[in-house]
């Protein structure tokens, strides 16, 4: 007689800001500028096992607002939005997509709010980050890893 298959368990234990920094290197003069800044976003995800079935996933965004004509940084915000997730009874080959796609999709709205709120509190108009397709980023990373090192395990860190 076969044992009944246990149902997968996915629980969000905690969502939190792990790290947050804001730099306004040319304050207060930068507040007198009339030029609209160019916004650059760098995005990365990472994960690690805390213990057993408990995982930490971190989505990091670095937003830089630069005055193009003067090549001057208005502000730079870096936020690490993290979550602790309990994941149990998920097959080994399915855990990476959960950590690389599902968890970042849960964390991203919190990250977007953190960035927007921080920029607004710094005295600038809010920066609203566009939605991110973490599944496409994950698949691209998997394809790149398969091409570059076909026999090596895939690094689950994604950069965008």
From Swiss-Prot:
Annotated GO MF terms: unfolded protein binding
Subcellular location, principal: cytoplasm
Pfam family, one: SecB
Sorted UniProt keywords: Chaperone, Cytoplasm, Protein transport, Translocation, Transport
NCBIfam families: PRK05751.1-5, secB
Function: One of the proteins required for the normal export of preproteins out of the cell cytoplasm. It is a molecular chaperone that binds to a subset of precursor proteins, maintaining them in a translocation-competent state. It also specifically binds to its receptor SecA.
Name of the featured protein: Protein-export protein SecB
Organism: Nitrosomonas eutropha (strain DSM 101675 / C91 / Nm57)
Chain's gene name: secB
């Amino acid at each position: 007689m076969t044992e009944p298959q246990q149902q997968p368990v996915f629980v969000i234990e905690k969502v939190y800001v792990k790290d947050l920094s804001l730099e306004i290197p040319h304050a207060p003069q930068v507040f007198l500028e009339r030029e609209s800044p160019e916004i650059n976003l760098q995005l990365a995800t990472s994960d690690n096992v805390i213990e057993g079935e408990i995982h930490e996933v971190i989505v990091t965004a670095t937003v830089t607002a630069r005055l193009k004509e003067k090549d001057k940084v208005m502000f730079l915000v870096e936020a690490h939005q993290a979550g602790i997730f309990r994941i149990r009874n998920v097959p080994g080959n399915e855990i990476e997509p959960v950590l690389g796609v599902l968890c970042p999709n849960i964390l991203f709205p919190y990250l977007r709010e953190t960035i927007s709120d921080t920029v607004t509190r710094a005295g600038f108009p809010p920066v609203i980050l566009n939605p991110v397709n973490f599944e496409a980023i994950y698949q691209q990373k998997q394809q790149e890893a398969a091409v570059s090192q076909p026999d090596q395990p895939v690094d689950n860190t994604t950069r965008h």
